[in-house]
Amino acid sequence: MKKTLISAAVICAVCGSAYASDVTLYGVVDTGLGYTYSDDDVAGESADHEFAMVSGQSAGSRFGLKGTEDVAEGLKVGFVLENGFESDTGSLGTAGKIFDREAQLFIDTAYGKLSFGRVGLLHSDAGSFGMMGDLSAFGTGWADIIGNQNMVFAYKPARMDNTVTYVSPDFYGLKIHAQYSMGTSSAKTTTDRTQVENESSTNRYFALGASYKIEALELYGLVDYVNKASYSDLATDSLAHHGKDQYTVTLGGNYDFDVAKVYLAAQYFDNAAEVGGEADETGFDLAKNDKAYGDIEGYGIVASTAVPVCGGSVKFTAGYMHAESDKTNKKANRWTAGAGYQYPVSKRTNVYTGVGYVQDSVNNRDPYAVQVVAGLKHSF
């Protein structure tokens, strides 16, 4: 009888481990201080100064749940639910969305991983699938300016709803990445049009990329395309600003020399509605992290490095962008530079500080901005 009970217990234990489920609570709290000085180089206008407590300067503050279950041999099902919040105020990162950073269900097999839901785009450093974080020592940037690739690359949202993502198995260091977003659905308001998922009233996103990792070398390539909305039921919305469909080609990589890790990335963009930061209908005003508005063609280059120093990491970066807007009949050149230091005070906590500079040359103006930040980041 004892042998039978022992055998049954062993069988149950084996079955339990073979088809085990696992759920993890995790998060990041990043809070710091930031000072920004910006001068638009416009006669009669004063420069702007801003000093504030800021959340997520080196990494977005968040908490999340993730879990997996082995449902059969070679078949795993999992999920990620991640919320972004402002650690300085306690508010949601995105109004109306509790899991704004990620909400996905995935299937993982020997043939690759297939994901469904709201996730970070391949052309981002966000979530489970973003590729851009490996192209810079600063990821996709600290604060608004320091090391921010989006300051010299075409802008896209970091995340999109209703997205299907596929990542292939590892073939001797090579992986294929593919993604399609059906866009979003939203009701009509006095200022916004109706958007219907996977129809011409919403922007849709396609991307195909590859990554190759072998020893100290990592290489990345990505082509992505935005099928811009072309229909509106809002009388005041002509969709003129949407223009032609946007595409970008991004190449880059990094190499770890032990004494320093070096990064290089370049991007060509065409028909981009926005480059730099936030939308600005008047055209280029980029030093304040604004985007140009129109069908923009151009390119950007970013180089950076991370050097181990005194138990931490010293980071340097420099970037350049040239962009032309046929719609606004403007050309712009942009230069960026940044430096930072990150020091781990424990396994899960680090302190950081950094400084960044950006300057434009556009329409006989040379606007510029300087940013200085310092903060504390804790992961759990």
Identify the role of each PLM range.
Residues 1-21:
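Gram-negative bacterial Sec-dependent N-terminal signal peptides
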Residues 9, 64-66, 104-108, 165-167, ...:
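Outer-membrane beta-barrel architecture
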Residues 21-35, 50-185, 202, 211-218:
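Outer membrane beta-barrel
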Residues 29-35, 81-83, 118, 178-182, ...:
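Transmembrane beta-barrel strands of outer-membrane/channel proteins
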Residues 33-41, 85-91, 122-124, 184-188, ...:
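Gram-negative outer-membrane beta-barrel proteins
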Residues 75-77, 111-115, 173-176, 216-221, ...:
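Repeated loop/turn-to-beta-strand initiation elements of outer-membrane beta-barrel proteins
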Residues 207-338:
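Detector for outer-membrane/organellar transmembrane beta-barrel domains
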Residues 368-380:
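Outer-membrane beta-barrel "beta-signal"
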